[in-house]
Structures are given as structure tokens and as C-alpha cells.
Swiss-Prot record:
GO terms for molecular function: guanyl-nucleotide exchange factor activity. Residues 1-50, 100-130, 529-552 are annotated as: Disordered. The modification Phosphoserine is found at S552. The lineage of its organism: Eukaryota, Fungi, Dikarya, Ascomycota, Taphrinomycotina. GO terms for cellular component: cytosol; plasma membrane. Residues 1-10 have a biased composition (Basic and acidic residues). Residues 590-723 form the N-terminal Ras-GEF domain. Residues 752-985 form the Ras-GEF domain. SUPFAM superfamilies: Ras GEF. This is Ras guanine nucleotide exchange factor efc25. The gene is efc25. The keyword Cytoplasm applies. It comes from Schizosaccharomyces pombe (strain 972 / ATCC 24843). It is found in: Cytoplasm. Residues 40-50, 102-111, 540-552 have a biased composition (Polar residues). GO terms for biological process: chromosome segregation; establishment or maintenance of cell polarity; Ras protein signal transduction; signaling.
Length: 987
């Protein structure tokens, strides 16, 4: 008797669960700055940079001091204290890199022109160094820093060789960094260097410290202000250094917000906000690359006149998407705050220490999951399917169940249990014992203990369930009596476990809100003081004259955005739809037609205009799966249903809003859901994701809609009807199921062309009406192995064409072949009168095929009126000018009508492949015009499917045609050779 392998489950019920968790032992890592330290605003000017530091800052390996104060720059030279300088960021005290440095293990590459001199000074050796996989490792041991060679990634430094000289003291190095006697002179290696490859290292990590996003934004504001000013004044020497500074800050932003890490490890797919974050990030990098290429593609940085407008356009495009990215991060704690403050269990993170439990060997938390909240739905889904399958097995199990069925029960339970165990084991709870979170130890102590007890209870119950299923494999063991009790206990245990985890998150959220509030107040005080000092600064001098650059300038990146928009405080905990109120051009309209927009904005427009714009409603619900998923659409509808009130409402205004706009919005959301389920729910009802979505919809409707709206019960009934609806009766399937022997002696040519044309029209229309709308949208016919209704129709049309060719060639004498040709010409003409363009096209295609077209002797005997008729039919199906004649006839055709399938498929393919998914003018907006065109084509097909023919059906003739077409010879080479044997080529 086979048993599923239980070794992989690593069951722990007999080993116990350790309830004490020690603080993770975080290893020591070398710390490096990924941004230059600006000690003087003039450092951005090329005239202040020495030749030996051509467009580059100095990066030197360092380590943490033992006295507890971290030196985030290692032995990086710093300006001398007696040097009078003005920081380019006056609201920052000291170097802003003290707050934004990253603990990244990097190495350095020597300049091809000058090797590095031995490193001296107060640099300390680190007991451990982790080398990045895509960087060059040191050529000598790290403890021996003499003559060591390192490389620095292009994503974290300036382009081109870096030359440093550490033979002098720190103060001399500092003076060397800021020496001003030489001007900027790019070299050949600099010009030919690759441009900014993004990091692809496993050592990218998520920051565990507080990130003040507004300070980042102010840095970009300052740099963009001066960059756009330099472009406007055509200050060619300042542009390269400003672009490089932007590059360094962009790397810092993506590094410290965790964007690089999440994209590299494909973790954004776990979030409902994946699309907007990834969409704007995918736009930021190309636009910045374009700006970089334009900047550094000119030798000696002599820009032609036409380059400056292109530079300005590229910079503005980059700024535009960067603002979206900033605002999106700031207003979604689900994205930014979670990675900075909340339990963040991320695989392969370089910090986190080790911890043990259940008597197992120590497992590094680098391999554990640090994203706790997104894991809850995944675990919930696994538990839900386990319980659902167990219920089905109990219901269907009997004393006479065969071995294969019992093995299926055992395998399924074992597989689901294994998934649940793996997900539970991947949760690293040691984050709650971090030294920075000591304030919440008392609050979390009870929750932690409850979590451990409940987790052990889940382990025990799952183990008992697996063992019980294993017992069924033994002879004379079919007792399922304890299964229902086990299932109920498992459900209760996991419900308690989820509640424990939610308690963790609530405690952390309260603490984080308090920390953010304090940080925000502290920053606002510094910001107000910094603005006062900044207004007293002298105007910045440029080579074109004196220009005053202030925060109210047209070039300022902050522009109309307020500080509150970018503050990570309590007010940032809002849905993504609230972001649309802060930004413009989210939905683009032309002549009352929606051309495009972001997904949340399109859903919002759908809800607000569900009764006013029926064309948009139909197009959206018909094509939504081409740009989103059912789960995401449902999530956005739920967010709109729970729409937040506008800020600042008093009790009276709130009551008015709740009874007015909010009530209408909720009612419209219910209307959209009802239409979606009733007419546009094209999902596979056997798929797991569909079952889980339907379960969520039921819960939402039962808990939130039914108590307030009667339509909630209607939608629940429609969901139940999804399984009770029977597929439409198919004439072709019934005919194909009839035996072939009945029709062997049937003579097709005993029927008139009119009768044959009418029966073919009924067959073609039956194939057409079997095609659901989703197959037109998703192009299910592309794969030849597809079993879609469109593919069945295509196969029948092709087989019918080959059958006509075989019917003509199977006649031994010329007169007989002539009679068959005339029969099908007259049939095609009758199809034209019936507006059956599909059969018409198949017949003409067969007569135009190489094996038939060359039968000149047979065509000479065809009547003149039939030849004239064939000539007119050929003009109708002529392909030139994109079937212009056929399209004109189709527009005038009245229902019922059978269109030519090939033209429909061509139009759908052209629309799908010939039109971008986003707007050319606004790449961050989805192109809804493309979806409108798809919906228009499908609407025409649905119109043809709606009206059927009222003709008598001849099942004998129809069955004969179907069976003959099913087994027809489609070897064109054989058919052509047979044609040659009947009418050899003339000499």
C-alpha cells in the first residue's frame, strides 16, 4: 500500500514548541555611503571638482565603531571644521547621508589610469564582509587593507574611473576632494562607460530604520530646481554633475524604500497595489536613462542647440513620474511604512540573526518570511482549501471506496498540510524583540505567548488529521467519525491564530503612529526654521546672470504639493483611490468618450457613471481581464463601497454625505457587481482562484450589502446560478454523436443548391452562436491545440473547404467534375441571398485553390451564367483594400446573418497587437480606447448571434456533411498530384 511521503512535513507535535525567543544576533557588516557628502553647494559645480575626481565622489570601506556610535561613512574624508561652507540643503544639520546611508557591502574598482595607493588612516577591519555577487571581490584579504582593490557598482556611483589618493591625512583628503583649480574634463573611458545598470545582488535589503520621505523629496526638489534652471540657462557644465547627483539620490530612494529588493525578489505581486507602484517605477528608470544618455552622449559636454529642449522634456518626464512614485509611497502605508516599521520578514535579508524552536537546528532568519501581513491571505487560502476538500471527502466517502480514491484523500490532505506547515515555519517573530521596540514588550508579551500556544495547537491538530488520513490506507480502516471534529477544531485554531497575529499588528501600528507623529512634528519644526534661514541666502550666480531660485519657482519639484501630502503620519493610512483626489489627468476624455486612465480612476468612473455611460460600462466589464484581474477589480469595488468621507466634515455635513453621495456610491457598486456576476463573469468555476474569489464575494455581500440593500440577495442568487446554468444546446454536437452508418448511401447532389445552402447556413450559425464573448477578447483561437469554440469553428470551415476540393477531384470524368463545380457555384450564390458569408467564402476559396483552379477542361463546360456568377462572388471575397466590398455588404446586411470568421479574427488581432496598452502621451495611463474598439467588434458579433434563422432543419444532410468534413483528406500536396493525374499539364 502506497503512502504519501511524510518525511517532508517535519511534523513537530512530539517535539514541542519553544515559547521563548531570544533576540536575534545581528551580524556586523561593513557600512558604506551610497551618496556623496555635500559640504558646499559649489560641489555641484564642475568648476569646483578636481580632475582626479572627475564627476565622482570618494567611497571608502569602513566599519562601525566599538563605542556604539556608528560611522556610516567609514574613513570617507569629511570637510574640515574650519572651512566656511553652505550646505545645499540648509534644513539639514550636518551631512544628510547620516540619515540616509545604507548598510551595503561593496567593493571598488581601480582607475585604469592610476592604481590605488595603499589605504592608511583610522580604517578598522571588520570581522565579516559579505561580497556582492555581481561586484569584483578584493584581491587580498580584507584584514590586510594595504594595496587592496575594490569595485563600486555603477548604480551607486558616478560613471567612469574613480581615482583616489589616501596617502595623505583625512584633512588633506578632504581638501583634495574639494579642490577647485581644475575644471571638468571627461575622458574617453568616461564617455564609453555603460550607463547605470541597476543592482541585481542578493545583498539588497529592506531598511529597518525610520525613513523621512519628505527629506528625500526635498533633495530631489533642490536638484531638479538647479537642473532645470541650468537647462533653461544652457549651463552645459553644470548639467552632468546634477544628473549624476540625481542618479545617486534615485539609487538611495529605491534602495531605502526597498523597491530594488522587492522587484528583484518579485515580492510586489503579494500586494493589491502592485500595478501602480511597479508601473511608475518602470517609467522612472527609462526616462532617467534617456536623460543620462542625452547628457553624456556629447564629448566635452558641448550640447547642440536642439539638445536642450530634449533634455528639458526628459527631465520633466522623469520628474512627473517621480512625483507619482513619491506620492504613492507616502500615501500608502501598505507599501512604505510596512517595510520600515511593521514586521518585515523578507527572504534573503542580510540581517535578522538566528533563532530556534521545536528542538530543530538553528535556521537563519535570512531565509524566513518578513512580510507578515501579505502571508495571512495565503495561509487562509491554504486552510480554506484543506477544510473544503476534507468536507467533500467525508460527504463522498463510503465503505466501498476503492484504493485510488483513498490514496487521493490521503495525498490531498498531506499536500495541503505540508503547505500550511511550510508557511507557518517561515514566520520569524523575532522582530518583536528588537532593541528599538522595547517600549511595546509588555503590550506584546501576552500576544506572543498566546501566539505560541495557538501555533502549537495548530501543529497538533494538523498532525492528527494527517495521521488519521494515513490510517485509512490500512486494511479494515475506514472510520471517518473523528474527521468532522478535527476539521472544526482546525478551523477554530487557525481563526485564533489569525487573531493573535492581528493583535501583533495593532500593537505595532499604535507604536508606529506615535513614532511617526513625533518624527513629523520634529521635522516640521526643523523645516520651518530651515525655510527662514533659506530665505536669507544670497541669490545663486550662473554664467547667464543672476537668478533667484526659491521654493515657489516654476522649477521647484514640490510645486503644488503640500508637506501634508508627503508626510508619513496617521493621515497617510488611506486607500489608493484617495490618491486620485490629489492628482490630475487620471481619466482622459475626448468627445465624451474615455480614452484612458489609471485602473483605480477607471473603476471609480465606472461606479459613478454605471447608469449614465452604458457603452463604457459594457466595454469595461467585457474587457477588464485584459488589464486587471477579477480579484483586483473586486478589491477596488470594495474600497469604493467603504469610501472614506471628505476631511473636515461636521456632524451635519457627515450625515448629509452619508445619505447622499455615499449612499449613491454604495448602490452603484452593488449595481456593478450585479452586472458583473450576471453577464460578464467569465471565470473557470473549477479554478482555485475563482472559488476563493467567490467565497470573498459571498462574505462581503452577506456582511455588508444584504443588511442595507436588497440587491445583495439578488447578487447572491446570481452567484448560485453560476453552477446551475446549463450550456446552450449545440446542434453540431448532437449531430456528431449520431452513427455514421446511417448516412453512407446519402447522395448530396440529390438536394438542390437552395436546400444545401440552407442546411449549411444552419450549421454555420450554430457554430457561431456557441462562441462566448470571452473567447473573442482573449484570442483563445491562437493555439492550434485549443479546444475553444472559435477553434472548432475554424477547423470546421477549413475542413469544409477541403471537402469541396475532394468532392470535385473524386469524380473520374470531366463532365462529372463540371457538374460538381456548378453545384457549388449555385450553392454559394444562394448563400449570398441568405447572407451566409462564411459558407460563401469557403466555397470560393475551394474553387480558387490550386488543385481546382487549374482544371481548365472542367471550367470550359461550366455554363456562362455560372461563370459570371462566380466572377461576381470572387469580387465580394477579394482581399484588397481590407475586404472593402465584403465590409460594405456586411454593413447593409439585415439580421439574421453569418459573417466571415476570418475578418473578425483579423480585426481583433490588429486591435490587440497594433495598439499599445497605455496612452502614448501618458504612458502611466491605461489606453481604454483600445478596449472600446475590442468591445465594438465583439458587440457586432453578439448582434449577429442574437438573431437566428427560421428554416427547417434536415438532420440527415447536416450529419452527413459534418461526418464527411470530420474525416476529410487535407493533404494539399496529395490533392494537387491528384489534380495533375486528372488533367496533366499541357505541353
Amino acid at each position: 500500500m502506497r503512502r504519501p511521503n511524510l518525511d517532508r512535513l517535519r511534523l513537530k507535535s512530539r517535539q514541542g514548541f519553544e515559547t521563548s525567543v531570544s533576540k536575534p544576533s545581528t551580524p556586523s557588516y561593513s557600512t558604506y555611503s551610497l551618496s556623496p557628502t555635500f559640504s558646499d553647494k559649489s560641489v555641484l559645480s564642475p568648476s569646483t571638482m578636481s580632475d582626479s575626481y572627475a564627476l565622482s565622489s570618494t567611497y571608502t570601506a569602513g566599519s562601525s565603531y566599538q563605542n556604539g556610535e556608528s560611522d556610516y561613512f567609514g574613513s570617507l574624508p569629511t570637510p574640515s571644521s574650519d572651512k566656511s561652507s553652505t550646505s545645499p540643503f540648509p534644513y539639514l544639520k550636518g551631512s544628510f547621508d547620516d540619515r540616509f546611508s545604507s548598510t551595503h557591502s561593496l567593493t571598488r574598482q581601480p582607475s585604469p589610469r592610476s592604481p590605488l595607493t595603499p589605504l592608511k588612516g583610522n580604517t578598522r577591519a571588520s570581522p565579516e564582509i559579505r561580497y556582492v555577487s555581481d561586484f569584483t571581490p578584493p584581491s587580498s584579504p580584507f584584514e590586510d587593507m594595504q594595496a587592496s582593490v575594490h569595485s563600486l557598482p555603477l548604480s551607486g556611483c558616478s560613471i567612469g574611473p574613480v581615482r583616489t589618493n589616501h596617502s595623505s591625512s583625512l584633512s588633506n583628503s578632504s581638501n583634495s576632494l574639494l579642490q577647485t583649480e581644475s575644471s571638468l574634463r571627461p575622458n574617453s573611458s568616461f564617455v564609453n562607460s555603460p550607463f547605470f545598470p541597476l543592482p541585481s545582488s542578493d545583498d539588497l535589503f529592506l531598511n529597518d530604520r525610520v525613513i523621512n520621505l519628505f527629506l528625500f523629496y526635498e533633495k530631489f526638489s533642490y536638484l531638479f530646481t538647479h537642473l532645470l534652471s541650468a537647462i533653461k540657462s544652457r549651463d552645459a557644465l553644470s548639467i552632468p554633475s546634477l544628473v549624476l547627483s540625481l542618479q545617486e539620490e534615485l539609487f538611495n530612494l529605491c534602495q531605502q524604500t526597498g523597491t530594488f529588493y522587492l522587484l528583484q525578489h518579485n515580492l510586489l505581486q503579494n500586494f493589491e497595489f502592485e500595478n501602480p507602484i511597479k508601473l511608475h517605477f518602470d517609467k522612472i528608470i527609462p526616462y532617467f536613462s534617456r536623460l543620462t544618455v542625452l547628457t553624456f552622449s556629447n564629448r566635452a559636454f558641448i550640447f547642440p542647440d536642439h539638445t536642450f529642449p530634449r533634455l528639458q522634456q526628459s527631465a520633466e518626464d522623469f520628474l512627473y513620474h517621480l512625483q507619482f512614485f513619491f506620492t504613492l509611497c507616502a500615501n500608502n502605508s501598505l507599501y512604505l511604512s510596512r517595510f520600515c516599521y511593521y514586521p518585515s520578514f523578507v527572504p534573503n535579508t542580510p540581517f535578522g540573526g538566528k533563532w530556534t524552536n521545536n528542538g530543530l537546528s538553528a535556521v537563519s532568519s535570512a531565509y524566513r518570511t518578513r512580510l507578515l501581513e501579505p502571508c495571512l491571505p495565503e495561509l487562509d487560502k491554504c486552510v480554506w482549501f484543506l477544510l473544503k476538500n476534507c468536507d467533500e471527502f467525508i460527504e463522498n466517502f463510503s465503505d466501498f471506496a476503492d484504493e485510488e480514491y483513498v490514496f487521493e484523500i490521503c495525498s490531498t490532505i498531506t499536500s495541503h498540510s505540508e503547505q500550511i506547515f511550510n508557511k507557518l515555519e517561515s514566520w520569524d517573530m523575532s522582530i518583536y524583540f528588537d532593541k528599538d521596540l522595547s517600549e511595546c514588550e509588555q503590550a506584546t508579551n501576552f500576544a506572543v505567548q498566546s501566539y505560541f500556544v495557538t501555533k502549537q495547537r495548530c501543529y497538533d491538530l494538523l498532525t492528527d488529521l494527517v495521521c488519521s488520513s494515513q490510517d485509512l490506507m490500512m486494511e479494515h480502516s475506514n472510520d471517518f467519525s473523528t474527521m468532522p471534529t478535527m476539521i472544526a477544531s482546525i478551523a477554530v485554531a487557525f481563526q485564533t491564530l489569525f487573531e493573535n497575529v492581528c493583535d501583533f499588528l495593532k500593537v505595532r501600528a499604535a507604536l508606529v503612529d506615535e513614532m511617526q507623529e513625533l518624527a513629523t512634528k520634529e521635522f516640521e519644526n526643523k523645516f520651518s526654521n530651515a525655510n527662514t534661514a533659506k530665505d536669507d541666502e544670497p541669490a545663486r550666480q550662473t554664467n547667464k546672470g543672476t537668478t533667484r531660485i526659491s521654493r515657489s519657482s516654476d522649477f521647484t519639484a514640490v510645486s503644488e504639493m503640500s508637506k501634508d501630502t508627503l508626510t508619513l503620519g496617521r493621515n497617510s493610512l488611506q486607500s489608493i483611490l484617495m490618491l486620485d483626489n490629489l492628482l490630475t489627468n487620471k481619466v482622459v476624455q475626448s468627445d465624451n468618450n474615455v480614452k484612458g486612465g489609471t485602473l483605480p480612476a477607471l473603476v471609480h468612473y465606472l461606479v459613478q457613471n454605471v447608469h449614465l455611460n452604458k457603452d463604457f460600462r459594457h466595454s469595461f466589464l467585457l474587457t477588464y481581464k485584459t488589464f486587471t484581474t477579477p480579484q483586483e477589480l473586486f478589491t477596488l469595488l470594495v474600497i469604493l463601497f467603504h469610501e472614506l468621507p471628505p476631511p473636515g466634515l461636521d456632524a451635519t455635513a457627515y450625515s448629509s454625505w452619508e445619505k447622499g453621495d455615499n449612499f449613491v456610491t454604495k448602490k452603484n457598486v452593488c449595481t456593478v457587481m450585479n452586472l458583473w456576476v450576471q453577464k460578464y463573469f467569465f471565470e473557470d468555476l473549477k479554478a482555485r482562484n475563482t472559488l476563493y474569489l467567490i467565497s470573498e464575494m459571498r462574505t462581503f455581500l452577506r456582511d455588508h450589502v444584504v443588511p442595507s440593500f436588497h440587491i445583495g440577495s439578488v447578487i447572491l442568487s446570481e452567484i448560485d446560478n453560476l453552477w446551475t446554468e446549463e450550456p446552450p444546446d449545440s446542434l453540431t454536437q448532437r449531430l456528431l454523436s449520431s452513427p455514421m452508418a446511417t448516412f453512407i448511401s446519402l447522395n448530396v447532389y440529390a438536394y438542390t443548391p437552395e436546400e444545401f445552402a440552407s442546411q449549411m447556413t444552419l450549421l454555420e450559425f450554430d457554430y457561431l452562436k456557441q462562441i462566448p464573448s470571452r473567447e473573442w477578447i482573449f484570442r483563445s483561437w491562437v493555439s492550434r491545440d485549443s479546444r475553444s469554440a472559435v477553434r472548432n469553428y475554424i477547423n470546421f470551415s477549413n475542413c469544409f473547404t477541403y471537402w469541396i476540393i475532394n468532392c470535385i477531384l473524386e469524380k473520374k470524368n470531366t463532365k462529372a467534375r463540371t457538374a460538381v463545380i456548378s453545384f457549388f457555384i449555385q450553392t454559394a450564390y444562394k448563400c449570398l441571398s441568405l447572407q451566409n458569408f462564411s459558407t460563401l467564402m469557403s466555397i470560393v476559396s475551394a474553387l480558387n485553390s490550386a488543385p481546382i483552379y487549374r482544371l481548365h477542361a472542367a471550367y470550359k463546360l461550366v455554363k456562362a451564367e455560372d461563370i459570371i456568377c462566380l466572377s461576381g462572388l470572387r469580387e465580394i471575397v477579394e482581399t484588397k483594400k481590407n475586404f472593402s466590398t465584403y465590409r460594405a455588404l456586411l454593413r447593409k446586411a439585415e439580421l439574421p446573418c453569418v459573417p466571415f470568421l476570418g475578418v473578425i479574427l483579423s480585426d481583433l488581432t490588429f486591435i490587440d497587437e497594433g495598439n499599445p496598452d497605455v496612452l502614448d502621451s501618458s504612458p502611466h495611463l491605461l489606453s481604454f480606447n483600445k478596449r472600446h474598439r475590442l468591445a465594438d467588434v465583439v458587440a457586432d458579433v453578439c448582434r449577429f448571434q442574437s438573431s437566428s434563422y427560421e428554416m427547417q432543419s434536415n438532420t440527415d444532410l447536416q450529419s452527413y456533411i459534418l461526418h464527411r468534413c470530420r474525416f476529410v483528406n487535407q493533404d494539399l500536396s496529395y490533392l494537387f498530384d491528384k489534380s495533375l493525374s486528372l488533367e496533366p499539364r499541357s505541353s
